[in-house]
């Protein structure tokens, strides 16, 4: 019984650490998105993809 409790406690501890690291990584990604240069790069990517999609529709006649 004691080893079962120890195992569950270890799993709980490791799960807590995993959630903490995931939250830190998510926060870091959000900070990068808040960077104006990063936002400009994302907008440029979308603009290029939209332009390519429009050209494809134009040439394919759809």
UniProtKB/Swiss-Prot annotation:
Secretion signal, residue range per the UniProt entry: 1-22
Keyword Secreted: yes
Tissue expression from the record: Expressed by the skin glands.
Gene Ontology biological process terms, A to Z: defense response to fungus; defense response to Gram-negative bacterium; defense response to Gram-positive bacterium; killing of cells of another organism
One GO cellular component term noted in the UniProt record for this chain: extracellular region
Location of the protein in the cell: Secreted
Family annotation (Pfam families): FSAP_sig_propep (PF03032)
InterPro entries, A to Z: Frog_antimicrobial_propeptide
Residues excised as propeptide: 23-44
Keywords: Amidation, Amphibian defense peptide, Antibiotic, Antimicrobial, Cleavage on pair of basic residues, Cytolysis, Fungicide, Hemolysis, Secreted, Signal
Residues modified to Leucine amide: 60
Record's keyword annotation contains Signal: yes
Family: Belongs to the frog skin active peptide (FSAP) family. Temporin subfamily.
Function: Has antimicrobial activity against some Gram-positive bacteria and fungi but has no activity against a range of Gram-negative bacteria except P.faecalis. Active against the Gram-positive bacteria S.aureus ATCC 25923 (MIC=37.5 uM), S.carnosus KHS (MIC=37.5 uM), B.licheniformis X39 (MIC=19 uM), R.rhodochrous X15 (MIC=4.8 uM), is virtually inactive against E.faecalis 981 (MIC=150 uM) and inactive against E.faecium 091299. Has some antimicrobial activity against the Gram-negative bacterium P.faecalis X29 (MIC=75 uM) and is inactive against E.coli, P.aeruginosa and S.typhi.
Protein name: Temporin-HN1
């Amino acid at each position: 019984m004691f080893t079962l409790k120890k195992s569950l406690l270890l799993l709980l501890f490791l799960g807590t650490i995993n959630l903490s690291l995931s939250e830190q990584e998510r926060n870091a990604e959000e900070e990068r998105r808040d960077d104006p240069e990063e936002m400009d790069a994302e907008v440029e990517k979308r603009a290029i993809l939209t332009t390519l999609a429009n050209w494809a529709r134009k040439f394919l006649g759809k």
